[in-house]
Amino acid sequence: MSIVKEAHNVKVLGSGEKTIVLGHGFGTDQSVWKHLVPYLIDEYRVVLYDNMGAGPTNPDYFDFHRYSSLEGYAYDLLSILEELEIKCCIYLGHSSSAMTGVVASIFRPDLFSKLILVSASPRFLNTDDYYGGFELEEIDQLCQAMESNYKAWIAGFAPLVVGGDMDSVAVQEFSRTLFNMRPDIALSVFRTVFTFDLRHFLSQVTVPCHIIQSSLDVAVPVAVSQYLHQNLGGMSIVEIISTEGADCFGSYRRGSEMETKRGSDDAVTIALR
């Protein structure tokens, strides 16, 4: 196995003609897609990977300087595509990985036929003329809480982001993947994600984008999805859904339902058409 495949725990499933690459968000790993993958493998070649710093990755490979910006993650994504000799793919990214796909598509637009951006935000911090959802003081307080007591921070952060109590499957899953991250790496990634400003990249995007946004997402206001739609350089559409919490956790909450039903109104299904 190559270094790239080993470092990112790359898995390739299915044998369809089209390739879809799934990128997970902060605090999770590729297991977040476990309820979605069974519905893709009959029609697509599905590529799963872990972002560097995620629990299943080797923390010794985490370069704090490289991953202090999303460009480092974008170059990792491009390396994976190159290693697998993927000439063109659909990229489905959640949260920070959605923006990783945006940046990677600017570097190599030929490798992407479509970007599906779930709970994407080019900037989480508010400015005088932009509403991202957070003030810098709030992010600083969250970082201080992480440094002070990482376990206690997870107990408060996971239910808030996912939307549910600690007994819910979705919250327990998110808590598990957060616990699997080394605390200092989790803090570094968190600070990078919640303080980046990628708005200047948007006009350079030429790949078609399908934006999926939950109306109840506590981390990304609906206004951000409209901002993306208005400022992306290429064609884009926005789909607002009513799933509570961060949208990638919908598969955990609806696990049994998704295993028995693939509704025509499923957001990802629609985006793949």
UniProtKB/Swiss-Prot annotation:
Domain of life: Eukaryota
Cytoplasm keyword on record: yes
Gene Ontology MF annotations: hydrolase activity
Main localization of the protein described in the UniProt heading: nucleus
Location relative to the cell: Nucleus; Cytoplasm
Catalytic residues identified in the record: 95 (nucleophile), 217
GO cellular component, one term: cytoplasm
Entries under SUPFAM superfamilies matching the protein: alpha/beta-Hydrolases
Tissue: Expressed in stigma.
Intrachain S-S bonds: none
Keyword tags: Cytoplasm, Hydrolase, Nucleus
Enzyme Commission code: 3.1.-.-
Enzyme class name: hydrolase
The family this protein is said to belong to: Belongs to the AB hydrolase superfamily.
Biological function: May be involved in plant olfaction during volatile communication.
Protein name: Karrikin insensitive 2 receptor B
Upper classification of the organism: Eukaryota, Viridiplantae, Streptophyta, Embryophyta, Tracheophyta
Name of the encoding gene: KAI2IB
